[in-house]
């Protein structure tokens, strides 16, 4: 009989999913395989080892490191490990997110995961039914999404009672509101786990009160996971209140700097972060070249702007100059929730090259797959946001490029500032970008022609430029981003302006607001015939009132020649009051005839201009006070008072 050969034990790769202890369920491995995730990221490996072992965790990891699965897998395992299903209307887990987009994204990832767990997939299939979900015979994961803008609070409660979910995912306000209902129960005997995702942003957005309310509804004996890209003092205080003896997980990426020095990076190695120095008028032509020349051609690109109005404006006009095959969509905080959701889904699911124009709304948390290119048209006012903007590309090991556009001069100092903050960026070398004067004129002319054809676009351009100026003034790195160093004419060309807005900065610079174009902007019509008809009627009234005022003033001038000096000051004051009253009346009437959108934009513009005016007045007052302190006026010589009390007139002599 041949001797039995000893069996060779197959060793599993140390970084594979199979190597985790305890091992993952087979259905979870099937999901990971179907998604192409061959091995866990460092944050996933560290988190799964601790969080699955009944320990609270605080996870600080770079953007795009795979935090979502790092907490979803342990949460699902905790909810399924019981012997019996959760009682009806009893919540076992909660995931808090700062924005509806991020909450929706987490919900969708969770649904795609638990579809591989047959009992949970069967339970979730009843989500769209009007009848109550049948009671499960074994533990399942049934999530409910709670975000504002799509449903009302009463509808959320109705869905909860019908579906009986055991895992809630949503924004702080909606979660706190649902938990306040007597029908929603989260006792210590049932509740398992709380997740706070993007915790620093939750606090930055002012959700501290809602978080405290939520914590008040939950038992202290629970597992808690706090996930964030950075840990601020406010987050540390939240950790003290919300977690018991947490284990801190910090995942850094290290790269070799010139000279062989190892330095920490706050972004994945797969992400290249670069800068391009270019005048304002060349920014858009440079973006067009970047999209044309980048190999392979970017499928999904994101361009960040400093304001909602800039996103709104450029999303209307940029399509005219983009390379063939590219489309444009937008995402910002002023959009209706349903429009935001539609645009987000359109960008995520696009099958052709698309450019998303957005504000810092999309800078954090949104895990948009396969973003190839991020361009920062405007550097963020808060340098901490820079890294999160860049992190939209190069996620989950995919190669990505992030480029920030800087104007020549002081703005180039932004590179050194980022290096000090452990966010080094390098000059963009590939693809080589070289913009000619002809390209600048072509792009600017394309923008201006659209503004000439539609007054709505002309007005958008004015509002966008004012809001950009406001954000530039408020930049934290004010020594680098100085309003006094700006080339207003070059900026106007970059925005495709037909005239500069009425702003104190433009007035102080003593620039011709017409830009030498010789365009009468009052004659630019609305494409919408109804709006144009209304505008013409208002314009006719205004001209009539102006002529009437001029006639009244002319008549008044003639009367002045024959008037006595006495009483003129009082008459002038009365006239000014009457004139101001008429002006306010006209403004009120004009405002009342505006659409809600026009009213909102008008108020924004007035508020912006007023804030800028106040700041400039305050600055001027400080400068006058400083000048007065440096050169105080000489004191005047005292006037000697003559005492003539003894020389009182006593009458004439006889």
UniProtKB/Swiss-Prot annotation:
It is found in: Nucleus, Nucleolus. A motif (DEAD box) lies at residues 197-200. The Q motif is unique to and characteristic of the DEAD box family of RNA helicases and controls ATP binding and hydrolysis. GO terms for molecular function: ATP binding; ATP hydrolysis activity; RNA binding; RNA helicase activity. Residues 531-631 form a coiled coil. GO terms for cellular component: 90S preribosome; nucleolus; nucleoplasm; preribosome, large subunit precursor. The keyword Hydrolase applies. SUPFAM superfamilies: P-loop containing nucleoside triphosphate hydrolases (SSF52540). Residues 48-249 form the Helicase ATP-binding domain. Its EC number is 3.6.4.13. Residues 542-654 are annotated as: Disordered. Belongs to the DEAD box helicase family. DDX55/SPB4 subfamily. InterPro entries: CTT_SPB4, DEAD/DEAH_box_helicase_dom, Helicase_ATP-bd, Helicase_C-like, P-loop_NTPase, RNA-helicase_DEAD-box_CS, RNA_helicase_DEAD_Q_motif, SPB4-like_CTE. One of its GO terms (biological process) is maturation of LSU-rRNA. A motif (Q motif) lies at residues 17-45. This is ATP-dependent rRNA helicase spb-4. Keywords: ATP-binding, Coiled coil, Helicase, Hydrolase, Nucleotide-binding, Nucleus, Ribosome biogenesis, RNA-binding, rRNA processing.
């Amino acid at each position: 009989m041949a001797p039995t050969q000893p069996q060779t034990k197959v060793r599993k790769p140390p970084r594979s999913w199979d190597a985790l202890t305890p091992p993952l369920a087979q259905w979870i491995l099937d999901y990971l395989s179907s998604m192409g995730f061959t091995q866990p990221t460092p944050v996933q490996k560290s988190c799964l080892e601790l969080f699955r072992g009944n320990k609270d965790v605080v996870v600080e990891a770079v953007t795009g490191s795979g935090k979502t699965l790092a907490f979803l897998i342990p949460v699902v395992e905790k909810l399924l490990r019981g012997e019996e299903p959760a009682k009806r209307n009893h919540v076992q887990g909660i995931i808090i997110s700062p924005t509806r987009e991020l909450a929706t994204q987490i919900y969708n990832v969770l649904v795609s995961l638990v579809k591989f767990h047959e009992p949970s997939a069967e339970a979730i299939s009843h989500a769209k039914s009007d009848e109550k979900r049948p009671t499960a015979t074994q533990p399942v994961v049934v999530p409910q999404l709670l975000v504002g803008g799509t449903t009302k609070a009463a509808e959320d409660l109705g869905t909860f009672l019908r579906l009986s979910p055991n895992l809630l995912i949503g924004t702080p306000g909606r979660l706190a509101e649902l938990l306040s209902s007597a029908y929603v129960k989260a006792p210590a005997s049932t509740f398992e786990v709380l997740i706070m995702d993007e915790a620093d942003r939750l606090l930055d957005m002012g959700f501290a009160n809602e978080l405290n309310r939520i914590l008040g509804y939950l038992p202290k004996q629970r597992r808690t996971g706090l996930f964030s890209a950075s840990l601020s003092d406010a987050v540390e205080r939240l950790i003290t209140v919300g977690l018991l003896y947490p284990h801190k997980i910090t995942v850094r990426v290290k790269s070799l700097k010139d000279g062989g020095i190892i330095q920490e990076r706050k972004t994945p190695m797969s992400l290249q972060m670069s800068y391009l120095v270019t005048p304002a008028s060349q920014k858009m032509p440079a973006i067009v070249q970047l999209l044309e020349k980048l190999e392979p051609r970017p499928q999904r690109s994101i361009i960040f702007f400093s304001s909602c109005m800039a996103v709104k404006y450029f999303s209307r006009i940029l399509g005219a100059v983009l390379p063939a095959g590219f489309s444009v969509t937008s995402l910002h905080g002023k959009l209706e929730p349903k429009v935001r959701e539609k645009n987000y889904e359109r960008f995520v699911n696009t099958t052709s090259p698309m450019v998303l124009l957005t504000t810092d709304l999309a800078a954090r948390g949104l895990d948009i797959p396969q973003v190839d290119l991020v361009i920062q048209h405007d550097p963020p006012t808060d340098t901490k946001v820079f890294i999160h903007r860049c992190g939209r590309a190069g996620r989950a090991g995919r190669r990505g490029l992030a480029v920030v556009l800087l104007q020549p001069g002081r703005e180039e100092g932004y590179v050194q500032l980022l290096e000090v903050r452990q966010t080094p960026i390098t000059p963009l070398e590939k693809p080589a970008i070289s913009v000619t004067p002809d390209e600048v004129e072509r792009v600017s002319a394309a923008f201006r022609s659209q503004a000439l054809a539609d007054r709505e676009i002309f007005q958008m351009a004015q509002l966008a430029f004012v809001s950009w100026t406001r954000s530039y003034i408020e930049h934290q790195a004010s020594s680098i981003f100085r309003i006094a160093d700006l080339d207003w004419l070059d900026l106007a060309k970059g925005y495709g302006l037909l005239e500069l807005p009425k702003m104190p900065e433009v007035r102080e610079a003593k620039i011709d607001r017409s830009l030498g174009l010789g365009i009468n902007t009052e004659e630019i019509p609305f494409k919408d015939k109804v709006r144009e008809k209304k505008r013409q009627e208002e314009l006719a009234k205004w001209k009539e009132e102006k002529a009437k005022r001029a006639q009244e003033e002319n008549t008044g001038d003639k009367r002045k020649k024959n008037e006595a000096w006495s009483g003129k000051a009082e008459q002038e004051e009365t006239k000014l009051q009457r004139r101001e009253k008429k002006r306010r009346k006209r403004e009120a009437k004009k405002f009342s005839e505006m659409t809600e959108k026009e009213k909102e934009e008008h108020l924004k513009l007035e508020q912006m201009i007023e804030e800028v005016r106040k700041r400039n007045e305050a600055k001027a007052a400080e400068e006058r006070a400083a000048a007065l302190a440096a050169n105080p006026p000489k004191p005047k010589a005292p006037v000697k008072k003559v005492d003539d009390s003894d020389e009182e007139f006593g009458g004439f002599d006889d």
